[in-house]
């Protein structure tokens, strides 16, 4: 009976994974199709579509913009997230639990809700639809990611390390930079990698706040509206490989915690 139950569970898990990830394998496979129309079976394999991508100016520009937004928003979220997570961990004050729930709102609310809200609110502040608006939008939800990742590490940190450093005469600022930060560096690296991936893949907020310049996901969306070609498959394959590598690295650093 146990063997049958184990087989059913294993088969069900395998079926779910196939349903989720088999389409990705199909995309990777068809990205090497030499023909412009996807057909099965593939008669001729080629790297032509990857080469063509390297000459696609709009795609290259979209990649540059995506990296620009991802890096700046991650840095901003890191600068705000580390001290915020430290304050949430170290100090107890009225409304702390409520504040933590509010901080988590950007990652719990649907992206379309956040995008519409920012689209309505930013003009009141005199912020036009632009890369600046996209940068602020990405930073908003990345702060929540950064705080949750680093706060989890703070909770596992030995409190006696900080106490010992203080007893030896170290100032609070020196304790933070010489004792606290080195002990949470793996969590910081993992949070940074995860934030970069999420920013690079973000669509709803970007869609509502972008102007004429496109990020990579928006550019891919525009290409798909004209039909799925092997060039789209090639872009999707590269994005998948880069995202997977970053996520695995993030998990590796988080596992070390």
Residue ranges and their predicted role:
Residues 2-5, 35, 50-58, 200-254:
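Interhelical loop and adjacent transmembrane-helix boundary motif
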Residues 60, 64, 68-80, 84, ...:
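Hydrophobic alpha-helical transmembrane segments of multipass integral membrane proteins
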Residues 63, 88, 105, 160-168, ...:
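Short hydrophobic faces within alpha-helices
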């Amino acid at each position: 009976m146990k063997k049958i139950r184990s087989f059913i569970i294993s088969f069900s898990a395998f079926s779910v994974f196939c349903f989720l990830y088999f389409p990705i394998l199909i995309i990777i496979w068809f990205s090497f199709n030499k023909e412009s129309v996807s057909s099965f079976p593939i008669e001729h394999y080629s790297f032509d579509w990857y080469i063509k991508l390297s000459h696609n100016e709009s795609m290259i520009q979209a990649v540059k913009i995506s990296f620009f937004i991802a890096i700046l928003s991650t840095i901003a979220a890191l600068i705000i997230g580390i001290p915020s997570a430290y304050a949430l961990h170290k100090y107890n004050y009225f409304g702390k639990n409520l504040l933590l729930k509010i901080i988590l709102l950007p990652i719990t609310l649907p992206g379309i809700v956040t995008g519409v809200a920012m689209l309505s609110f930013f003009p009141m502040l005199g912020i036009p639809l632009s890369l600046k608006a996209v940068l602020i939008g990405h930073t908003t939800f990345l702060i929540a990611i950064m705080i949750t990742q680093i706060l989890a590490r703070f909770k596992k940190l030995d409190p006696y390390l900080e106490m010992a450093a203080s007893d030896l005469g170290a100032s609070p600022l020196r304790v933070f930079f010489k004792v606290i930060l080195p002990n949470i560096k793996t969590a910081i690296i993992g949070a940074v990698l995860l934030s970069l991936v999420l920013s690079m893949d973000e669509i709803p907020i970007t869609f509502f706040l972008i102007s004429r310049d496109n990020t990579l996901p928006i550019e891919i969306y525009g290409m798909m509206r004209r039909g799925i070609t092997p060039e789209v498959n090639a872009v999707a394959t590269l994005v998948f490989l880069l995202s997977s590598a970053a996520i695995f690295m993030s998990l590796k650093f988080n596992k070390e915690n």
